């Protein structure tokens, strides 16, 4: 899920970067055209809205409640086990250092 989000974010940034670069080239050709600037802003806004909707759709499509609950349960059990084993290990180290 995280890698898909990063991929979508990368694609959005790539599209925006290409759009900005094209806008800069067009702006250098005709710097006094406000209509061109409006078109570029609308284009960037539409690309952003499309990418945002696609990312939200992808997130909602891949989100599974049962998997989320299983992951939370596995995390809580494994962290409880690690806490127990860390306590035992710490106790053993103290016993070795104290010499009893």
Curated annotation (Swiss-Prot):
Compartments where located: Secreted
Gene Ontology BP annotations: lipid catabolic process; lipid transport; positive regulation of phospholipid catabolic process
Highest taxon listed in the record's lineage: Eukaryota
Identification of the protein by name: Apolipoprotein C-II
Organism: Bramus lutescens (Transcaucasian mole vole)
Record's comment on post-translational modification: Proapolipoprotein C-II is synthesized as a sialic acid containing glycoprotein which is subsequently desialylated prior to its proteolytic processing.
Region of interest called Lipid binding, as start-end residue ranges on this chain: 66-74
Keywords: Chylomicron, HDL, LDL, Lipid degradation, Lipid metabolism, Lipid transport, Secreted, Signal, Transport, VLDL
InterPro entries according to UniProt: Apo-CII, ApoC-II_dom_sf
GO CC terms of this entry: chylomicron; high-density lipoprotein particle; low-density lipoprotein particle; very-low-density lipoprotein particle
Signal peptide segment: 1-22
Entry GO MF terms: phospholipase activator activity; phospholipase binding
Free-text function comment from the UniProt entry: Component of chylomicrons, very low-density lipoproteins (VLDL), low-density lipoproteins (LDL), and high-density lipoproteins (HDL) in plasma. Plays an important role in lipoprotein metabolism as an activator of lipoprotein lipase.
Main location: secreted
Annotated region (Lipoprotein lipase cofactor), positions in chain: 78-100
Entry's family note: Belongs to the apolipoprotein C2 family.
Transmembrane region(s): none
Pfam families named in the record: Apo-CII (PF05355)
């Amino acid at each position: 899920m995280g890698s898909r989000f990063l991929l979508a974010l990368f694609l959005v940034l790539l599209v925006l970067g290409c759009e900005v670069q094209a806008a800069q080239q067009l702006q250098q050709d005709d710097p006094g055209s406000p209509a061109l600037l409006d078109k570029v802003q609308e284009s960037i806004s539409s690309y952003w809205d499309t990418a945002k909707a696609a990312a939200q759709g992808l997130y909602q499509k891949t989100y599974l409640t049962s998997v989320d609950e299983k992951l939370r349960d596995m995390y809580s059990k494994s962290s409880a086990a690690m806490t127990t084993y860390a306590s035992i290990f710490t106790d053993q180290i103290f016993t070795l250092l104290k010499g009893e």
